[in-house]
Amino acid sequence: MLPADQAGIPPCQGPRARSAPISFAIPKGAWDTHLHVFGPTAVFPYAEKRPYTPPDSPLEDYLALMERLGIERGVCVHPNVHGIDNSVTIDAVERSDRRLLGIIKPHRVMTFTELRDLKTRGVRGVRFAFNPQHGSGALDTELFERMHGWCRELDWCINMHFAPDALEGLCDLIAGAETPIIIDHFGRVETAAGVNQLPFKILRDLATLDHVWIKLTGADRISHSGVPYDDVVPFAHALSEIAPDRLLWGSDWPHSGYFDPKRMPDDGDLLNLVARFAPDVALRHKILVDNPARLFGVI
């Protein structure tokens, strides 16, 4: 592990410089619906309160990854290390030559006028990240209700990232939403207890709802077996039987929060998982192309 900085905040690893070759034909118009941009911190400093300090992973590095993987469109999700200043994400979206859309972090002083302006600049939703890794294990329900109403007016989505033990308490809120809800990283349900564990049963129930979308992202974060993530495949198959038209794929680049370089996932390995998640080419096309294009109105 790298030494902590003067504030005692541990630095985490950056992404791999190279990626494994892709094992299947990437369809034209493929999307990566979950990526982050960090820095450069000389221009976009990190929030003082943060769980770790990642190295700069600027837009240019991600665009190079898109070229290597054959991805055409992406969704830049605002990272917690940048706090409530969404500038880094908005800048990336605006400089991406219309290849990226943005998901921002909401806060209590935001106004509807501000959000309406951000829609013209490529933003398409907000994200509530309240898992313990991000320093908070509770949802700000008052802010959620306010943003829910505004997102409904703007035709935006709400991304949610939480610990799996929060699923049961969130059921009514998610089920009652009137705007698309995207659950990140398989709901963070870890694979060790199998597909019959209660959190995954709850996730499957939520996946039956027409406004609930599931990101098949973060396989490296929920797997107990590690590369090639065999234990994640049954979870993806179970979800594809329920919601084939509301599954999304994302890289989660640059994979923040890893302190051991040996655990840093390979972006090629993660994309190759799609062929195992969806052996059927038509389903694969839905996950990579049709579903995100429909959700984000790019059809």
From Swiss-Prot:
Main EC class the enzyme belongs to: hydrolase
One function term, GO molecular function aspect: 4-sulfomuconolactone hydrolase activity
Family: Belongs to the metallo-dependent hydrolases superfamily. Sulfomuconolactone hydrolase family.
PANTHER family with a match to the protein in the record: BARREL METAL-DEPENDENT HYDROLASE, PUTATIVE (AFU_ORTHOLOGUE AFUA_1G16240)-RELATED
Effect of pH on activity: Optimum pH is between 7 and 7.5. Approximately 30% of the maximal activities are still detected at pH 5 and pH 9.
Cofactors, names only: Zn(2+)
Source taxonomy: Bacteria, Pseudomonadati, Pseudomonadota, Alphaproteobacteria, Hyphomicrobiales
E.C. number(s) listed in UniProt: 3.1.1.92
Quaternary structure and partners: Monomer.
Reactions accelerated catalytically: 4-sulfomuconolactone + H2O = maleylacetate + sulfite + 2 H(+)
InterPro entries: Amidohydro-rel (IPR006680), Aro_Compnd_Degr_Hydrolases (IPR052358), Metal_Hydrolase (IPR032466), SML-Hydrolase (IPR053519)
Gene3D superfamilies per record: Metal-dependent hydrolases
Protein name per UniProt: 4-sulfomuconolactone hydrolase
Function recorded in the entry: Involved in the degradation of 4-sulfocatechol which is a central intermediate in the degradation of substituted sulfonated benzenes. Catalyzes the hydrolytical desulfonation of 4-sulfomuconolactone to yield maleylacetate.
Keywords from the named record: Hydrolase
Domain of life per record: Bacteria
